[in-house]
């Protein structure tokens, strides 16, 4: 994990100081008072179901990931963006698919990456064209889809349970 060593506001060294129940990196200059809160970053994730591929679910491999690793399409929110709009935009940017319907699946803390995943089910249509962030994709029929037990896989698990329930 990258750690700040100097205050990004004033350049003073940082020291660990107990604030609000945890040790936090805090600016040594009391007049500055900058604190590294290390709060989780929200990201949107899409369980994309392709209308014109018999409802197959799209999993993608990020260009930075090793071979064989696939997960949901994810992305950051822009300032002032509604999460449901952000997921539609990310699906369009990363896969060129057009979202027809968006439904919240759930919220999933992902501690290892210090993220909060906002997971949506997205019914989509169109021709799949990946952008440079993604290396390859797989289309998996929902009845063959297997959830993984971390990160966006927990949203897949819940979505599958809802379909079968
Ligand atoms: Zn400072």
Which positions does each model-derived feature cover?
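A short coil-to-beta-strand element that immediately follows conserved catalytic motifs
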Residues: 16-18, 97-106
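Active-site-adjacent beta-strand/loop module that shapes the phosphate/pyrophosphate-binding cleft
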Residues: 106-129, 133, 138, 142
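Conserved Nudix-box catalytic region and its N-terminal flanking loop in Nudix hydrolases
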Residues: 50-93
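Conserved beta-strand segments that form the floor/walls of ligand-binding pockets within enzyme
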Residues: 9, 26, 71, 103, ...
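Short acidic/glycine-enriched loop/turn segments that link adjacent beta-strands
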Residues: 21-23, 67, 111-115
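Acidic, metal-coordinating catalytic segment for phosphate/diphosphate chemistry
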Residues: 2-45
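Conserved hydrophobic "DFG−1" position in protein kinase catalytic cores
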Residues: 48-49, 59, 122, 139
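NUDIX/MutT-family hydrolases
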Residues: 130-161
């Amino acid at each position: 994990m990258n750690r700040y060593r100097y205050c990004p506001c004033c350049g003073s060294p940082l020291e660990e100081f107990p604030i609000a129940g945890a040790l936090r990196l805090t600016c040594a200059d009391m007049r500055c008072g900058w604190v590294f809160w290390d709060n989780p970053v929200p990201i949107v994730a899409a369980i994309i179901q392709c209308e014109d591929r018999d409802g197959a679910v799209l999993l993608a491999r990020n260009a930075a990931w090793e071979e064989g690793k696939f997960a949901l399409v994810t992305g950051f929110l822009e300032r002032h963006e509604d999460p449901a709009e952000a997921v539609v935009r990310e699906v369009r940017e990363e896969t060129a698919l057009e979202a027809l319907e968006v439904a919240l699946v759930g919220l999933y803390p992902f501690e290892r990456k210090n993220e909060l995943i906002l997971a949506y089910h997205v019914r989509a249509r169109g021709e799949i064209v990946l952008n440079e962030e993604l290396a390859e994709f797989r289309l998996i029929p929902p009845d063959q889809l297997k959830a993984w037990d971390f990160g966006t896989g927990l949203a897949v698990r819940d979505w599958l349970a809802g379909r079968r329930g």
